[in-house]
C-alpha cells in the first residue's frame, strides 16, 4: 500500500499518532498536520529526517480512505493507516506524540457529561494500549475527547493504577487535556463584539484572552480582565461574552441541527497545540508556554511541578485544573498559579467557586470509573 511505512524510515522520524483520525475532528486535524507540519522541519535538524503521521480508527474502511487521500498531498509528511484489523500497536510504536480525538460526538441536548460512560470506556482502552506500546518516559498524550474534565483523570488514573511500569515514568506530567478551543473562542468573540460595538477599529490581529478552569460550561473561566485587548465593554456585554465562551459548543451543535458538533474549530485548536509539541521535540524551541488541563499532583501525591503547591489552595485542592504551564521535553515544569491571584473580584468570588465545585465532581466521576473498572477486572 502507498501509505505504509518501512521500519528504517520510522526510526528517523518524529511520529505522531492520531487516535480517532477518521472522525470529524480527526480528519480535519490530520489534514492540517499533513499540510502544515513541513514548516517545522529545519535543515539544521539532522536527528529527525521527517515527520510521520500514524492514523488510527476503528472504522477500517474510513481510515484507509482518509489516509490514501492525505497521502496524495504534496508535502514531505508521511502517513500510514491503522485499524483494529492490523492492531493499534503498529500505530503507537515509537510515537512521540499521541493525540486523541476518538469518541462519540455530542448530539442535541447532550452535555459533555452525557458522553462520559461511552467515552470513558474508549479512553481507558486507549490508555491501556499507550501504556503497553509507548515509551512512558517520553511520550506526550493530548486528550481532545470529551468530557475532558473527567476523561483526563480517567487516562492518568488508569495508567498509573493498572500499569506498574508507569509509576516512575513521569507520564502524569505529559498527559494533558486540550482546552485550547475555549481560548480560541474567547479571542474570536471578544474581537467580534468590540468591532460590532464600534469600540475598536477592525485590525488584523487577535486578542489574547486567558481561559482557565475546565472545559465544560461554568467550569470554563474566561479571564477577559487579563486580555491584552483594551476594551470598554459594559457589564451586559461581558456577561454575554462569558456565557458564549462557556456554551460555544452548544451554539455549533444547534447550528448544525444536531448533525454535528464543533469539529473544524476544534481541529484548528488542536493543530495549534500539536504544532507546539512538534516544535519542542524537534528542538526548534526549548519550552512551551500554554494552557492545558493537567493533574496538579504526581504519582506520589506531591505537587506536579513548581507552582502547583501554590495553586492547590487557591482552587480548594482540586486535583486537576486548566492553567498556563511551562512545558519542556520532560513535561510540565512550571505552573503559573499567579494568574489566579490576578483575577478580578467577579472572577475570583463568583466564577472560581462555581468552577471548582463542578470540576471536583467531574474529576471524582473519572476517578470512580477507574476504581470500579479496576475492581471488576
From Swiss-Prot:
Record's subunit section: Homodimer.
Residue numbers carrying Phosphothreonine: 6
Active site feature: 215 (proton acceptor)
UniProt xrefs under SUPFAM superfamilies: LDH C-terminal domain-like, NAD(P)-binding Rossmann-fold domains
Protein name: Malate dehydrogenase, cytoplasmic
GO CC terms in record: cytoplasm; cytosol; nuclear periphery
PANTHER family, sorted: MALATE AND LACTATE DEHYDROGENASE, MALATE DEHYDROGENASE, MITOCHONDRIAL
Main EC class the enzyme belongs to: oxidoreductase
The species this protein was found in: Saccharomyces cerevisiae (strain ATCC 204508 / S288c) (Baker's yeast)
Something else known: Yeast contains at least 3 malate dehydrogenase isoenzymes: a mitochondrial (MDH1), a cytoplasmic (MDH2) and a peroxisomal (MDH3).
Domain of life: Eukaryota
Enzyme Commission identifier(s): 1.1.1.37
